């Protein structure tokens, strides 16, 4: 708090733009004096932790904080309709909705691979031409919920199903251990952070996006632009 306040107070900023439920609270408290001096505070909510179907603890913990702290912001920006509708009932005087983040659909729709490249890319991951490749893209964190797909793969128990997980994050070891405990470690491929998502979407058969919380959801939009069948949760901005 002291470090943030020192930065805010020493900068003489016109606009202080904060993100995320925790850091935005810290920043708004730290910026009270700056606001009195004329600085504006903008808060971009990347998806409220409370939403239709969210755990009760999320509503108990996050809703009162967001409601109370909304009075200490000059503009509250949301990125999906559910958050926007709810934020209108808060104390913020200026609530906006960003209607969408740009996606270059041609980058995915017009992306064509040669047969040789298709085979080579799948082989590099450990997947044959006859296997069913299930793809997901996202941080390896609890709210991305990759574990539900790993459990589903184990329950289906089909020899030719392979789950390719793109991304990195703190839950990687837990997910690897889960796959091992279910005896499907050889079917779950953790390929890390990738810059060739358009290629991977073209060689995949199914895209999954099982998030339990999502502000907007760019990854499933990219999958749809690639023409992939999509299995997704229906939360937040999805």
Question: What positions do the PLM features span?
Answer:
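Aromatic "clamp/platform" in nucleotide-sugar-dependent glycosyltransferases that forms part
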Residues: 193, 212
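Nucleotide-activated donor-binding/catalytic signature segment of Leloir-type glycosyltransferases, i.e.
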Residues: 176-192
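Short His-centered aromatic/hydrophobic patch
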Residues: 18-24, 45
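Donor nucleotide-sugar binding/catalytic pocket of nucleotide-sugar-dependent glycosyltransferases
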Residues: 67-118
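A conserved mid-protein helix/loop that constitutes part of the nucleotide-sugar donor-binding site
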Residues: 132-155, 170-176
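Short hydrophobic beta-strand element within catalytic cores of glycosyltransferases
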Residues: 229-232
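Short glycine/serine-rich donor-binding loops of glycosyltransferases
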Residues: 217-220, 238
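Nucleotide-sugar donor phosphate/pyrophosphate-binding loop at the beta->alpha transition
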Residues: 2, 40, 50-72
């Amino acid at each position: 708090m002291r470090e943030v306040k020192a930065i805010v107070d020493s900068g003489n900023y016109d606009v202080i733009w904060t993100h995320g439920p925790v850091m935005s609270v810290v920043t708004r408290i730290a910026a009270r004096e700056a606001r009195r001096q004329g600085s504006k505070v903008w808060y971009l909510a990347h998806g409220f932790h409370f939403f239709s179907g969210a755990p009760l603890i999320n509503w108990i913990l996050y809703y009162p904080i967001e409601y109370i702290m909304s009075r200490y912001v000059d503009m509250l920006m949301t990125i999906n309709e559910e958050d926007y509708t709810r934020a209108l009932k808060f104390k913020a005087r200026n609530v906006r909705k960003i209607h969408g983040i740009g996606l270059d659909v041609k980058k995915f729709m017009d992306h064509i691979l040669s047969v040789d490249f298709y085979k080579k890319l799948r082989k590099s991951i450990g997947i044959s031409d006859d296997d069913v490749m299930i793809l997901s893209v996202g941080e390896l964190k609890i709210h991305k919920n990759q574990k539900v797909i790993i459990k589903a793969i184990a329950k289906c128990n089909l020899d030719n199903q392979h789950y390719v997980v793109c991304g990195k994050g703190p839950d990687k070891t837990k997910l690897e251990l889960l796959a091992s405990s279910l005896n499907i470690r050889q079917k779950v491929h953790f390929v890390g952070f990738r810059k060739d998502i358009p290629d991977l979407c073209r060689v995949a058969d199914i895209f999954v996006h099982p998030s339990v919380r999502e502000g907007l959801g760019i990854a499933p939009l990219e999958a749809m632009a690639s023409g992939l069948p999509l299995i997704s949760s229906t939360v937040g901005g999805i």
